[in-house]
From Swiss-Prot:
Domain Brix: 50-241
InterPro entries membership: Brix (IPR007109), BRX1 (IPR026532)
Organism: Drosophila melanogaster (Fruit fly)
Region (Disordered), start-end ranges: 1-42
Main location: nucleus
Keyword DNA repair: no
One Pfam family recorded for the sequence: Brix
Name of the protein in its database record: Ribosome biogenesis protein BRX1 homolog
């Protein structure tokens, strides 16, 4: 039995024809956004390896922390980091990014548990630039409860206002936003399709950020959140350091605004006290001043009242006679003006006669 099995020859495997694959197959004329992406497209190379370090310094409020959490959910290419101590300077952020292999940084810095500042910087080689913003009108996703919804990790479209192509400092900020907020293509943590859009609108010398879900291919949108306003403060040449390239001339710090409001409230109290003192000083002793015809009501005799009225009428008539009427005054003024014109004409005639005699 063993010999029989040993003598059996192995069958030769059938040879398969090698057909060259077309690397760039023709695409259909129309594709729907709901179509499933084939697996081959998912295995393409991840070239743009942008990584953003998103973290905060100690001293931010709960709402600021929730905003930072929302931004992290919208940016799958972010890297987390624990809170930075207050004793450390901003130049340490470049070293932290180098340790985490990040080339962009987004730092949230709180002041007095009220004000929130955001830094966006290009930390690759500490070349910069970096921009500082004051964050205003913060509304998180949980607070808004909008009807829009987008898949976690999907790539967004970035929409910019037309003014971002006109002003030079906005051109720089646009490029910084594009490199920070946009999710790299074929990122391992990203979904291979686009279903929401980030809008950056320049209005009232501030940048308004909104996040919308793309409902349909014809442009239907529904807001998702979060929403906040970035008031640009300064743009620096380096990463968290360097010369100031641009500074906002219209920027007023929140502490200065609160100081002005407190001063206005204090002035309101001082004005009220001054008005009270002035009212007490100028308050009349008598309830009313005397009338012109008080004498009429002192006596009930009608004869005496008639005499008083006749005396008052006579007195008014005498005063009116003393005053010159307006018509007489205007007549005198016209006569004086005519006399002055005649004098001027006579002088000019005399001058012309003298000149003729000399000639």
């Amino acid at each position: 039995m063993g010999r029989k099995f040993q003598n059996k020859k192995k069958k030769a495997a059938p040879q398969l024809e090698i057909v060259p694959l077309d690397e760039n197959p023709p695409l259909p004329p129309q594709r729907s956004s709901d179509d499933v992406v084939p697996k081959k497209a998912r295995k393409e190379k991840w070239v743009n390896k942008q990584r953003v370090l998103v973290f905060s310094a100690r001293g931010i409020s709960h709402r600021d922390r929730h905003l930072m959490k929302d931004i992290k959910t919208l940016m799958p290419h972010h890297r987390p980091e624990s809170k930075m101590e207050r004793s450390k300077t901003l130049s340490v952020v470049n070293e932290m990014c180098e340790m985490k292999h990040c080339n962009k940084a987004m730092l949230f810095e709180g002041r007095r548990k009220r004000d929130l500042y955001m830094w966006i910087s290009n930390t690759s080689g500490s070349t910069g630039p970096s921009a500082k913003f004051l964050i205003e009108n913060i509304h998180t996703m949980a607070e808004l409860k909008m009807t829009g919804n987008c898949l976690r990790g999907s790539r967004p479209l970035l929409s910019f206002d037309s003014k971002f192509d006109e002003l030079p400092h906005l051109k720089l900020l646009k490029e910084l936003f594009v490199q920070t907020y946009s999710v790299p293509n074929h990122h391992p943590k990203s979904q291979p399709f686009v279903d929401h859009v980030f809008t950056f609108t320049y209005l009232d010398k501030r940048i308004w950020f909104r996040n919308f879900q793309i409902l349909s291919e014809d442009g239907g949108l529904s807001e998702v959140g979060p929403r906040y306003v970035m008031n640009p403060v300064k743009i620096f040449d380096g990463s968290f350091t360097g010369k100031t390239i641009w500074e906002n001339p219209d920027y007023v710090s929140p502490s200065k605004q609160r100081q002005v409001l407190k001063k206005a409230a204090k002035d309101k109290y001082v004005n009220r006290v001054e008005q009270k003192v002035k009212h007490e000083a100028t308050r009349p002793i008598r309830a009313y001043d005397g009338m012109d015809n008080d004498e009429l009501f002192e006596d009930d005799d009608p004869v005496e009242t008639a005499k008083i009225l006749a005396a008052i009428a006579k007195k008014k008539k005498e005063e009116a006679a003393k005053q010159t009427p307006k018509s007489a005054l205007t007549k005198k003024i016209k006569e004086k003006q005519l006399q002055a014109v005649k004098d001027v004409i006579e002088r000019k005639k005399a001058r012309t006669i003298k000149r003729v005699k000399k000639v």
